[in-house]
Amino acid sequence: MKKIGFLSFGHWTPSPQSQTRSAADTLLQSIELAVAAEQLGADGAYFRVHHFARQLASPFPLLAAVGARTGRIEIGTAVIDMRYENPLYMVEDASAADLIAGGRLQLGISRGSPEQVIDGWRYFGYQPAEGESDADMGRRHAQIFLDMLRGEGFAEPNPQPMFPNPPGLLRLEPTSMGLRERIWWGAGSNATAVWAAKLGMNLQSSTLKSDETGEAFHVQQAAQIRAYRAAWKEAGHAREPRVSVSRSIFALIDDRDRAYFGNGREEEDQIGFIDPQTRAIFGRSYAAEPDVLIEQLRKDEAIAEADTLLLTVPNQLGVAYNAHVIEAILTHVAPALGWR
């Protein structure tokens, strides 16, 4: 394992038990947690993106703010729902945030997850083309986004512009060259992982996927990663791909940890449906003393296959506690798994 970061779902609720009671709380604490994680030596700060929910949504203002406050840590998403995105406008936003961060963005994109509303992308002005599903539309938006990130001119210039143009067709500005290689696809199935490999995207595999074989979650996820790497090699890309997996992992160090996570729940995979047609398997959580955690995680085949591990954090418990969660893993667990 080469890198470890955190993944925040960015929840807020007006409950008195929550440390994030407003959108402002969540946004500002997300920045502070990224700063704290960098100081602790973590490698990445990643954020979920959900629309129509009390969670983080359009991510680029947050990513830019984190980029301005940090200097080393990778900054990313897991994932942006491409059904909601104007891919050209997204190139401009993503490039601006990447330039502010000095080329540290790692953008996870996908077709999205189950929504809070029915066909929410329609309210954003998007419709699948005739014969397209909404998932097809998301993948089409993704391919346009990837093409535009190449930085090639495509727009006919005005012969009488307000400001002088460079020669030839014009491209989107700003375009951050190099960001194209730091785009990840959140794949929920083996087929979409292979598709992502062919297009030269890195792979994000989360805490759930389509249940394709009935095997344990980590076994299926490891097989997905191997299929992805084989497709990448077959495609003949010049660089090595990156692969991340997400896990809920808590080292029980003190009484707070045991009170929050020491109840033994969710220690087995769960089966459910992410839509009426798709049976899904949800990966287990891990919560134990560090020596027990190390042995459990060594048996996780997908963690062994990946180069990046994202720790899902309970952001509503506040910056100080989540920094403690990250530090406990980095100090007491990660070195035994080959990190650093």
Model feature map: region roles:
Residues 44-66, 207-218, 310-323:
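Glycine-rich, proline-tolerant flexible connector loops at the mouths of alpha/beta enzymes
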